[in-house]
């Protein structure tokens, strides 16, 4: 099972949304993403009806970094220092990859609906926003 850029409703170190909030300089690539809760549903399908193979566990209709940032802004998840720069200006130690994977095989072999990427990004962002509000109320 292959995943790309995991997203979830917790601000964990591996969560793409956490990473974007921490970075000041961003590049605008389109990449596939994987909601970790939807991934667990998919793994359940594999367990129930195992069929060997390599399966891409990613959502349909991948979004660009700019589109993801706009969604985060809709939920008051913002880094005021965000600045989109060309890839060659990014100060990095290792090259970055941009990768769009097809979920066709995982969808058809297991009759699994990965759903639209934007829906899962909005769901996770809204839960993070609510969690921040709850902490402020305590």
Model-derived features: where do they sit?
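Residue-level signal for the nucleotide or nucleotide-sugar donor/cofactor binding architecture
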Residues: 31-34, 63, 101
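Mid/C-terminal beta-alpha module of Rossmann-like enzyme folds, strongest
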Residues: 42-98, 129-137
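A secondary-structure boundary/capping signal
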Residues: 2-3, 59, 102
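Amphipathic terminal alpha-helices
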Residues: 107, 111-138
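NAD(P)-dependent short-chain dehydrogenase/reductase
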Residues: 1-38
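Hydrophobic residues at beta-strand termini and immediately following loops
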Residues: 1, 26-27, 57, 85, ...
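Amphipathic alpha-helical segment in the mid-to-C-terminal domain
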Residues: 36, 65, 113-117
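Alpha-helical elements of Rossmann-like donor-binding domains used by nucleotide-donor carbohydrate transfer enzymes
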Residues: 15-19, 25, 38-45, 67-71, ...
